[in-house]
């Protein structure tokens, strides 16, 4: 259980850091056949990364995350993340931050590595 929290914390830190500073690297967090839902719209990884790299610069603040180990043949982890994001070009004021809520399923890539 403790390792699932460690992996979740590492994922959240790396993913949102990449989202803010290295969007071209976001694809490394997904398998080639991953299906992504963005505001209810299903997309493949290539479509998703193309969309992400064209968004304005952002500053993300993760407010909270929770993780639970999912039992099965492999140890997988479900992560729920909430926070705020502000896109460049918006004047800083109380309404310039947009809340987000995301759910991820980390799937074991090797016997000891999720990321």
Swiss-Prot record:
Its main location: nucleus. Stimulator of protein export for NES-containing proteins. Also plays a role in mRNA nuclear export. Disulfide bonds: none annotated. It is found in: Nucleus. GO terms for biological process: poly(A)+ mRNA export from nucleus; protein transport; ribosomal subunit export from nucleus. Residues 7-115 form the NTF2 domain. The keyword Nucleus applies. This is NTF2-related export protein 1. Keywords: mRNA transport, Nucleus, Protein transport, Transport. InterPro entries: NTF2 (IPR045875), NTF2-like_dom_sf (IPR032710), NTF2_dom (IPR002075), Nuclear_transport_factor_2_euk (IPR018222). GO terms for cellular component: nuclear pore central transport channel; nuclear RNA export factor complex. The keyword Iron does not apply. PANTHER family: NUCLEAR TRANSPORT FACTOR 2 (PTHR12612). It holds the Pfam family NTF2. It comes from Schizosaccharomyces pombe (strain 972 / ATCC 24843) (Fission yeast).
């Amino acid at each position: 259980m403790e390792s699932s929290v460690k992996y979740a914390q590492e994922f959240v830190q790396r993913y949102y850091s990449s989202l803010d500073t290295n969007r071209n690297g976001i694809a490394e967090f997904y398998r080639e056949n991953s299906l992504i839902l963005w505001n209810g719209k299903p997309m493949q990884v290539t479509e998703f990364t193309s969309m992400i790299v064209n968004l304005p610069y952002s500053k993300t603040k993760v407010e909270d995350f929770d993780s639970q180990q999912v039992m099965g043949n492999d140890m997988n982890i479900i992560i729920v993340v909430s926070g705020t994001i502000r896109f460049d070009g918006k004047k800083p004021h109380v309404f310039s931050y947009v809340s987000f809520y995301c759910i991820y399923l980390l799937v074991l890539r090797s016997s000891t590595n999720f990321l």
